[in-house]
């Protein structure tokens, strides 16, 4: 896709320079081709939806990174929601996806990241996800809240594609009779809301996951009205959580004899009339302490506990179950995944179990033996297996199965190998999915094309922008978040990064550097204080001095690669500092709230303040009128840029684009 990038609304700070209005010429438009830099995955893929009849038609959803359609021609996923603007970013969290079983071209995406935000929208496509009609709905969604791996909450009636049901978290059951164009609440559906104390932060993530699963039983319904028998599960515990309608959704009643000691997480209906549900004592992905797998024979009205791991004493299991899937061609073949099992009952990690006799016996897939191919996303080799909140058996190929994780997902094409005692082979299925959270980017002039600081997975060094980092995420140490990464502009091989540690790494420091362009890393010997982490890092043009402003801290200077530190004088706390790309003695920082430009001419030891006549509109984060957050790791207008090859040449971005084009206040600042 070709897009136009215009250099408008960008302000040039001219420290100590004369008026240059006459030197500023109009900037012509430049054509750019935009594409993702592949990391592959990097975020929670919390749901996969296969079309039941059309081979190769499948979609996946993420908690806050949009939705994707599988493209068999390119053998990767295609993003569907990259067109959503910053102002509409709440729609990037996907609550559910539904495909019309009678028409694979009709797909519906329920969007909304947080129930505390504005109402959500349902995006309706009738051309396989190539275009969408946006339908605003009068209820909120929680694509990034607890229970986001449950599902599916939205389903198209398999016998009447005009009818769609949508289960919400806080607003009950809704129905569309016109392919998603309008929605009405099903007032006869029972109240499944939960009460919680808004002041209790521990309860925030579970203030109500609401309706989590919808299943249609098509047996015996062939009158054109749609499906008569519909099952709906709600994330409730200690009260009835599974309901059925036998009159096309007009009335509802709880299914008798159901287990109420857990919350449903997933539900499938087998071809021989068994409703199979996984349960946990939380919706997940929060920790589970109990759960089970149960099946309900809808013809005999009989419940059976078919949990793969059962305790003889009847106590809490210490873990729960996340998801279940059934072979479309053999109703006795199912797989089920656990949550919070690792380190318990002889299992090193969470497990996926397979049964070929309808749940009478199960075999553990990972414990029996497995092989992983990490080549498509090398960083996953050190990422632990977790959050298997959707598992799917391909309806067109029973050997092909997938499971999701917090960094993407895996797939196999020899699922039945476990029955023969052979390894099940897994490879990354996330090609094309890019859900990482970039916190900082650095592009050296030579060597690596890009060095990134990433949320959750540390960071990467890309020597080829078309391939994942073959070295995996940065090591020594592994960071969870890398909030700062930069280098010495006149000494290109020197790179420094700061962040927060991933997991338990005794003795590890939260600052590390590379002297070979990001290939290998060395931990600094010390940090300024015991609490120093994250924040921002600046490196002198020749690498002789580094300045680190840890999170919520004053700035510190080192001239010996972190062996010792001293406080910088003349700066407020938590301010972002950058280095001049020509003069190694010069550093700068901006306080956009107070409109002050700080500069140092002694290698960062001391800073002096000058008034900054900042006329451009500033980014307001939070409530209307709130001041920009100084030191914001994701941007804000305290981020300034130094120009390579030009001493004292600094740039700052205007949040309103070309609106600030007319502003011109010299000699301190020019708007271009």
Protein language model annotation of sequence segments:
Residues 83-87, 137-145, 188-205, 307-315, ...:
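Surface-exposed loop and turn segments in beta-propeller and other repeat-based domains
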Residues 66-68, 120-124, 172-175, 241-244, ...:
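A short loop-to-beta-strand structural motif that recurs across blades of beta-propeller domains
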Residues 42-43, 84-88, 139-142, 190-193, ...:
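Short coil/turn segments at the loop-to-beta-strand junctions that recur within blades
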Residues 38-65:
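Beta-strand-rich domains and repeat architectures in extracellular enzymes and scaffolds
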Residues 65-66, 113-117, 171-172, 236-239, ...:
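Short glycine/acidic-enriched loop and turn motifs that connect beta-strands
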Residues 52-54, 101-103, 158-160, 218-226, ...:
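Residue-level detector of Asp-centered blade-edge/turn motifs that repeat once per structural unit
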Residues 662-668:
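Conserved small/polar residues in nucleotide/adenosyl-binding loops
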Residues 44-47, 91-96, 148-153, 200-215, ...:
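Signature of short aromatic-glycine-proline-rich micro-motifs recurring in repeat-based ectodomains
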């Amino acid at each position: 896709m070709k897009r136009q990038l215009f250099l408008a609304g960008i302000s040039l700070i001219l420290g100590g320079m004369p008026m240059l209005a006459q030197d500023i010429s109009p900037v012509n438009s430049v054509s750019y081709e935009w594409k993702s830099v592949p990391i592959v995955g990097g975020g929670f893929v919390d749901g996969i939806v296969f079309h039941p009849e059309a081979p190769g038609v499948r979609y996946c959803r993420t908690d806050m990174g949009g939705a994707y359609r599988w493209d068999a021609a390119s053998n990767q996923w295609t993003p569907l929601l990259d067109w959503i603007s910053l102002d509409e970013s709440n729609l990037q969290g996907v609550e559910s996806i539904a495909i019309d079983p009678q028409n694979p071209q009709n797909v519906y995406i329920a969007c909304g990241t947080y129930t505390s935000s504005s109402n959500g929208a349902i995006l309706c496509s009738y051309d396989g996800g190539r275009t969408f009609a946006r339908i605003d709905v009068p209820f909120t969604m929680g694509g990034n809240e607890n229970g986001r791996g449950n599902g599916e909450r939205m389903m198209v009636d398999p016998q009447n594609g005009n009818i769609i049901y949508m289960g919400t978290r806080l607003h009950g059951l809704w129905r569309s009779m016109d392919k998603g164009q309008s929605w009405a609440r099903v007032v006869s559906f029972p109240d499944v809301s939960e009460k919680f104390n808004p002041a209790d932060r521990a309860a925030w993530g579970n203030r109500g996951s609401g309706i989590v699963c919808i299943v249609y039983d098509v047996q015996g319904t062939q009158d054109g009205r749609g499906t008569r028998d519909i099952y709906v599960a709600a994330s409730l515990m200690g009260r009835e959580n599974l309901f059925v309608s036998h009159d096309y959704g007009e009335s509802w009643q709880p299914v008798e004899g159901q287990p109420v000691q857990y919350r449903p997480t997933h539900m499938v209906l087998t071809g021989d009339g068994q409703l199979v549900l996984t349960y946990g004592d939380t919706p997940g992905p929060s920790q589970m302490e109990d759960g089970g797998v149960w099946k309900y024979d809808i013809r005999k009205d009989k419940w059976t506990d078919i949990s793969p791991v059962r305790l003889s004493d009847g106590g809490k299991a210490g873990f729960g179950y996340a998801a279940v899937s059934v072979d479309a061609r053999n109703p006795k073949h199912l797989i089920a995944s656990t949550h919070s099992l690792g380190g318990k009952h002889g299992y090193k990690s969470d497990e996926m179990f397979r049964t070929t006799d309808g749940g009478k016996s199960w075999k553990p897939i990972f414990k029996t033996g497995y092989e992983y191919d990490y080549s498509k996303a090398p960083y996953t080799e050190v990422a632990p297996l977790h959050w298997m909140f959707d598992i799917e058996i391909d309806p067109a190929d029973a050997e092909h199965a997938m499971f999701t994780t917090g960094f993407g997902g895996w797939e196999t094409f020899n699922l039945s190998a476990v029955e023969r005692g052979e390894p099940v082979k897994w490879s990354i299925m996330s090609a094309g999915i890019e859900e990482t959270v970039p916190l900082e980017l650095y592009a050296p002039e030579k060597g690596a094309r890009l060095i990134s600081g990433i949320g959750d997975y540390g960071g990467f060094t890309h020597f080829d922008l078309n391939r994942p980092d073959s070295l995996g995420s940065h090591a020594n140490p592994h960071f969870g978040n890398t909030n700062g990464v930069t280098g010495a502009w006149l000494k290109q091989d020197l790179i420094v990064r700061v962040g927060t540690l991933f997991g338990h790494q005794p003795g590890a420091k939260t600052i590390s550097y590379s002297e070979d362009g990001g290939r290998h890393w060395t931990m600094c010997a010390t940090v300024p204080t015991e609490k120093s982490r994250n924040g921002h890092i600046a490196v002198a043009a020749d690498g002789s001095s580094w300045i680190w402003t840890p999170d919520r801290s004053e700035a510190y200077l080192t001239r010996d690669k972190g062996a010792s530190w001293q406080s910088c004088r003349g700066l407020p706390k938590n301010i972002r500092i950058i280095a001049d790309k020509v003069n190694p003695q010069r550093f700068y920082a901006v306080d956009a709230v107070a409109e002050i430009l700080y500069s140092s001419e002694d290698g960062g030891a001391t800073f002096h303040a000058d008034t900054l006549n900042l006329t451009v509109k500033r980014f307001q984060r939070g409530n209307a009128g709130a001041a920009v957050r100084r030191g914001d790791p994701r941007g804000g207008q305290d981020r300034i840029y130094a120009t390579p090859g030009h001493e004292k040449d600094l740039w700052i971005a205007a949040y309103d684009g070309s609106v600030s084009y007319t502003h011109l206040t010299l000699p301190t600042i020019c708007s271009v």
